[in-house]
């Protein structure tokens, strides 16, 4: 079972909630640059468009494995100085920053695919504890508000990061390069993203405290009892089997939603650059300007998603929803 944390939680101010959620800005910078421009990097390195989904496959497989493991481990972590979730924030941010910075410098497809794999794994290490932090820190009456603040930060991060290559081009950074070389506009965008990712997560680490377990001695006993790989594996399987019905229903919805997400992220750049802009030469001005535009379109999608999420959160808080199926 999951060790209990302190239940007497104080109501937090807007800025306290903002501080604890601010790291999501960097996480979303990483996800937006990954989702909007990794296919562009793959194509620049010579990938055929039909092979792009295979190059992407590491990302969802990594998330499938990393998320339950990180969730299990972070639930059973406590250090008087470093807290419960913050060690995962830090190490995930460190690895993500390195992978994000070096991804556009890949000289071969296997290097770019490896960078994507490391980037996705590292972002998941930071992201999952961030979601759990809302439940850790906020009383029940403020949890919805906490997720709304996270949604706001996610939308801002998606829009800004997705427009970075376009902005770099506008201020004069070269947007084309020789065959097999990623343009400087993309390299600069990923470097800025790496800086924002690490600094925003570090800001949350430095400005946010965590509640200790209700009973530290009991917490340590529980952790010792479930020590080891096999115990952890059994606990994860047990948690999945005992998942509430509503979560299982949500899982089905998410399962089908990700068909669309994965198709969009992997194929948006090759499809739009070729069929809308008529550009297939990755060294041409036309292709790279079109690829910048694809990123901007995905940024707009993120911004619109944010507004709809805020509207739905408001509606859900005002209207009693019948959840019978």
Residue map of PLM features:
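Intracellular loop-helix junctions on the cytosolic face of multi-pass helical membrane proteins
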Residues: 1-15, 107-114, 123-126, 130, ...
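Helix-loop boundary and gating motifs at the non-cytosolic
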Residues: 6-62, 248-253, 257-282
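Loop-to-transmembrane helix entry
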Residues: 48-60, 148, 184-185, 278-303
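MFS transmembrane alpha-helix packing/gate-lining sites
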Residues: 62-66, 153, 157, 300-308
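Helix-to-loop junctions at the C-terminal end of transmembrane segments
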Residues: 65-82, 307-321
């Amino acid at each position: 079972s999951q060790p209990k944390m302190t239940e007497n939680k104080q109501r937090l101010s807007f800025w306290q909630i903002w501080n604890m959620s601010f790291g999501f800005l960097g996480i979303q910078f990483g996800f937006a640059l990954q989702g909007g421009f990794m296919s562009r990097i793959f194509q620049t390195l010579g990938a055929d468009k039909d092979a792009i989904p295979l190059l992407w496959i590491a990302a969802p497989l990594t998330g499938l494995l990393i998320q339950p493991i990180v969730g299990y481990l972070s639930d059973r972590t406590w250090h008087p100085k470093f807290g419960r979730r913050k060690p995962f924030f830090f190490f995930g941010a460190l690895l993500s920053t390195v992978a994000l910075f070096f991804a556009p410098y890949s000289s071969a497809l296997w290097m770019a695919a490896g960078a994507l794999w490391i980037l996705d794994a590292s972002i998941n290490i930071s992201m999952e504890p961030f979601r759990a932090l809302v439940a850790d820190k906020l009383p029940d009456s403020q949890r919805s508000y906490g997720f709304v603040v996270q949604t706001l930060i996610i939308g801002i991060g998606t829009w800004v990061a997705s427009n970075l290559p376009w902005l770099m081009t506008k201020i004069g950074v070269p947007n084309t390069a020789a065959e097999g070389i990623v343009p400087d506009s993309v390299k600069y965008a990923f470097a800025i993203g790496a800086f924002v990712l690490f600094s925003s997560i570090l800001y949350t680490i430095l400005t946010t405290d965590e509640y200790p377990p209700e009973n530290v001695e009991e917490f340590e006993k529980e952790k010792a009892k479930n020590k080891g790989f096999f115990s952890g594996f059994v606990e994860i399987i047990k948690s999945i089997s005992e998942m509430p019905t509503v979560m299982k229903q949500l899982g089905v919805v998410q399962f089908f939603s990700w068909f669309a997400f994965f198709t969009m992220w992997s194929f948006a750049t090759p499809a739009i650059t070729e069929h809308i802009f008529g550009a297939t030469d990755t060294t041409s001005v036309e292709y790279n300007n079109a690829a910048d535009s694809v990123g901007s379109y995905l940024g707009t999608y993120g911004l619109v998603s944010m507004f709809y999420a805020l509207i739905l959160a408001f509606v859900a808080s005002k209207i009693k929803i019948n959840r019978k199926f």
